[in-house]
Amino acid sequence: LQQVLGQGASGIIYRAHRRSEQGNHPVAVKLFKGALTSDGLPRSEKAACIAAGEHPHLIPIHGKISAHPEGELGLVMSLIASEFVTLANPPSLQTCTRDVYAPSTRFSLAVALRIAQGIAQAAQHLHTRGVLHGDLYAHNILWNVTGECLLGDFGAASFLPPDDVVTVMRLQKIEVRAFGCLLEELLQCCDAKDALLQALQQRCLHVNPEVRPSWGEIQACLAEYSAAGCSCETDSP
């Protein structure tokens, strides 16, 4: 293990090298802090990460740590390029449930749309794999200036009940609401305003979960907006 790259409630992430027949390769290693954290059980996070599978907007997982000399649990992940930064900081005592964005964080609508599309695709992928992320916040998202993004941190993740369709739908709509909060924050960081995206955001936050759109509807709306002529631009974080 080398230098610390970051840490959260459930563990510490280190830069490391993975040995193979082809040589040493830089990776990131997450070691969990203990048997129980504020996010839950490390073994639950590990299971959810592995069950999530591969997706362009999820941080790739290469495997789990075994035979650690101190018996610690951990995961081996891809080392993400330094151009990716955390979208926002966790909530403060003042904001309670809302993440804290740097005052300098501004997006074009194109970049905000690209982030929204990536996270919506990742969330839909997780749900089809039976995984509920449980912490769909900006502080768990890495992004770069073109709007490429990665969703990480499965500390609060859980598995959807396979034989209870009603409960699955309700849990998915809770995550849709979380996406609505994220979309609202992204739009607040845009100088330009867009009525279509604001309407989608408001539907995601509807007080009646049954009125909230499905992930398929969200994807279709974002794709339609993108096809209407919104092209990615380069912004500064």
Walk through the language-model features, giving the residues of each.
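ATP-binding glycine-rich loop module of kinase domains
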Residues: 9-47
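Terminal C-lobe "cap" of eukaryotic-type protein kinase domains
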Residues: 207-213, 217-231
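Structural motif at the C-terminus of the N-lobe alphaC helix and the adjacent alphaC-beta4 loop
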Residues: 48-56
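C-lobe/activation-segment region of protein kinase-like
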Residues: 150, 155-201
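Catalytic-loop of the protein kinase fold
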Residues: 123, 127-144
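Short beta-strand micro-motifs within the conserved protein kinase catalytic domain, predominantly
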Residues: 60-73
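Conserved short submotifs of the Hanks-type protein kinase catalytic core
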Residues: 70-84
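Activation segment signature within eukaryotic-like protein kinase domains
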Residues: 115-116
